[in-house]
Amino acid sequence: MAYTLGGKVGHAAELSEYGKAKVAFDTTSKLLKGIGANEICWMSHTDYVTELPEGFRIIGKTPTCPAAAIECEAKGFYGVQFHPEVNHTPKGSALIKNFLFEVCGCKGDWTMTNYIEDQIKKSASRLATARLCAPSP
């Protein structure tokens, strides 16, 4: 993402990170709401952002990864260099929830029942004026 948006990415052969790392976070970011200033995260990378794209700021860093988390709140772009989806990142689920609910504005009220009811209404509406042939064995 950083490279595609005009930033620069370098190879960190000697500074690569694999395993647990303590990330220092700027907790003023919506993405990091309720997450501590220093958290353990699971890293697995050999490349890193060397120059941020215009409008971005660093919201997380380690001693060997100066841009472990970045954001451009104005454009709605957020990126992390670690793995929030794994158990080895204890606050990863909180970060994902923040992305969904704080950043993207998801509501969290979706249920399979609501989906089924909505699809039945849509189908009934489409079939109200249609001809239907439904052979059965």
Set out the residue ranges of the language-model regions.
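RNA-binding accessory domains that recognize and position tRNA/RNA substrates
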Residues: 3-137
